Amino acid sequence: MILPAFSKTYAGVKALDFPGTSLKPARIYAILGANGSGKSTFAKIVAGVLSADRNVCISGSIGYLPQKPYAFRRSVEQNILLSGGTQEDAERLMEALCLTDLRQKRADRLSGGETARMVLARLLMKRYDAVILDEPTAAMDMESTAAAESLILEYTQQTGCVLILVTHSLQQARRIANEAFFFRKGTLLEAGAAETVLYHPAKLETKQFLQFYGDTTQS
């Protein structure tokens, strides 16, 4: 997948300046950076839900899970099946994300973590050329996060999609990402193999970020 160069300006201030790159299939790209660094703006533009300063053309089908996804006032099972796919797919995803016992519960009565699991299952019902997940496990507990990460890995490998994962969790990036992009003040400061960016970054700003938000040594 080819991402062209693009930028985004708000009230005369450039919030994002992306140089463009190519993304490899069957790879997970962790998008890292502090709050306000441009991560979500990048994700929204690639997903096509936010316009850049100039038109951006990205080929292929794209699935997008925003930070605050919409849940229909229907049952968990009905929400998941709205994406299409088979009942068998829905059963498998509900079981993997511990939603089977909640299948008849209305979505507007779910907790934050339950909703996060449901909307992830709904997205993964379909096959896309690229999937963009913006903080998909932020509301989940450790057990649910582990199940979600396992599904994300499985989906990426089985479909061969490009998966873009916006995350504040360095631990999550270390567990499942193949590649990492580090944004700072709207600029892509560093990009490369996750192992390199997360443990042996070239830029001082990346090192400082890793030291502040988490230990850079392997455990």
Which positions does each model-derived feature cover?
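Conserved ABC ATPase "signature" region
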Residues: 88-102
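H-loop/switch region of ABC-family ATPase nucleotide-binding domains
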Residues: 167-168
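C-terminal boundary and immediately downstream tail of ABC-type ATPase nucleotide-binding domains
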Residues: 198-219
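Conserved catalytic motifs of ABC-family nucleotide-binding domains
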Residues: 69-84
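The feature captures the beta-strand-to-loop junction immediately N-terminal to the Walker
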Residues: 32-34
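Catalytic Walker B motif of ABC-type/P-loop ATPase nucleotide-binding domains
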Residues: 131-134
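Conserved ABC ATPase signature
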Residues: 106-110, 114
